[in-house]
Amino acid sequence: RFFLDSMLPGHERLNYNVIGSGVSENPDAKPAIEYAEDFNLTYMKAAPGKGPSLHSHDHIEVFIAMTGRWSVTWGEEGQHEIFLEPFDVISVPVGEMRAIRNAGDSDAWHLMILGGTNPSRVEWHDNVIQRAQDAGFVLDEDGNIQEV
């Protein structure tokens, strides 16, 4: 699993870094093409109702629905929502809290494009960090998932 929230029920998913390392909290996650300049590309597959929880980045993130229907929420508490259908695109600004989940009834894919050559780590919403700690997971000083 690539991310702290993917250790929590409802947020399990598969990530495939294609170009560049993207953002990951698992040091074993390696991209197909390591070299990336100015952008990173990742595919994600999620079951119905699952996907990344509320988080932000200090770089631009673009979501492109490839299959299925996706809910994208944003705002400090995820209070805004829009639905993406195949090939719909949304760009989430730097620092904006966002989450995305499969809103369909079967497994679905979406594509993420991250701006920058070396995108920064994920900034999780406080409730995600607390839920992960309650489940026995933290991030170490290097930003990697550790079980406690």
Regions found by a protein language model. Name each.
Residues 42-44, 63, 111:
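Conserved hydrophobic/aromatic positions in well-ordered beta-strands
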Residues 46-49, 84-105, 113-115:
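Conserved metal-binding segment of the jelly-roll/cupin
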Residues 20-30, 40-57:
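Conserved short histidine dyad/triad with adjacent acidic residue
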Residues 1-38, 140-148:
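A short, N-terminal "cap"/entry segment at the start of jelly-roll beta-barrel domains
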Residues 56, 60-86, 96:
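A short beta-strand-loop-beta hairpin characteristic of the jelly-roll/cupin
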Residues 5-7, 48, 132-137:
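Non-heme Fe(II) oxygenase catalytic core, chiefly the N-lobe of the double-stranded beta-helix
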Residues 29-35, 52-57, 74, 81-83, ...:
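Short histidine-centered beta-strand/loop micro-motifs
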Residues 99-148:
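Double-stranded beta-helix
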